[in-house]
Amino acid sequence: MTGLCDSHLHTPLCGHATGTPREYAQAALDAGLSGLCFTDHMPMPRWYDAPWRMKLEQLPEYIAEIQAVQQEFAGRLDVRLGLEADFHPGTEKFVEKVLGMFDWDYVIGSVHYLGAWGFDNPEFVAEYEERDLGGLYRDYYALVEGAARSGLFDAIGHLDLPKKFGHLDPDPVYALHALDVVAGQGLALDFNTAGWRKPVAEAYPAPDLVRAAAERGIPFVLGSDAHQPGEVGFRFADAVKEIRDVGGRTVTFRHRKMQP
């Protein structure tokens, strides 16, 4: 897999990942990758999702840890530094402030909450049985469109995340409209192989959405969403084939600029 970069991975600072940044970098080398970009969950206001992300005061520690890995692996592995940010209405100013604190390489914009419901958290999966799936996906993709229009992010994370536990979208109309917005804003999509490790057993986005995105000229950024070193580069050969089979392309980011 020479030449490939894993641009979605986490560190223990988020509270739900294991392994040191150095171990992730070594795993990338062992997998034959040429680079990786750390994108740990960014700090948010204290009332928001606090157990699942670093605190604001830990941000310098995160930066220092990755810079140490950059130095150690220089000449062997292209190590970049980014964030996975959340789009949640009302927090945009806070996110903008954090994004202005450092020269990040890549910022993913993800939606993990519908109101107060963390819909990708296994602890709250029973809530799906109380929801109308059509309305759920309508509301979710409205937030994705908000993320795309916000100007805060470089790519949209795990596009069809609500399918994680097998609750599939009954109508693609909202997803396709969201793709129109993503394309119009010039953003990329996180091709997130973690879906192959989840109950849905399907990468994010689904194959039909990968094709639809490629038809709209939206590029993909490969990401394993690794929360442990053994997940780095997970099924990247399959990901590349799926993207290329529909005429899509992959990119990476450096200093918030898209690179082929």
Curated annotation (Swiss-Prot):
GO terms for molecular function: histidinol-phosphatase activity. Keywords: Amino-acid biosynthesis, Histidine biosynthesis, Hydrolase. SUPFAM superfamilies: PHP domain-like. It is an enzyme of class 3 (hydrolase). Pathway: Amino-acid biosynthesis; L-histidine biosynthesis; L-histidine from 5-phospho-alpha-D-ribose 1-diphosphate: step 8/9. Its EC number is 3.1.3.15. It catalyses: L-histidinol phosphate + H2O = L-histidinol + phosphate. The keyword Hydrolase applies. The keyword Amino-acid biosynthesis applies. One of its GO terms (biological process) is L-histidine biosynthetic process. InterPro entries: Histidinol_P_phosphatase_HisJ (IPR010140), PHP_dom (IPR004013), Pol/histidinol_Pase-like (IPR016195). Belongs to the PHP hydrolase family. HisK subfamily. PANTHER family: HISTIDINOL PHOSPHATASE-RELATED (PTHR21039), HISTIDINOL-PHOSPHATASE (PTHR21039:SF0). This is Probable histidinol-phosphatase. It comes from Deinococcus radiodurans (strain ATCC 13939 / DSM 20539 / JCM 16871 / CCUG 27074 / LMG 4051 / NBRC 15346 / NCIMB 9279 / VKM B-1422 / R1).
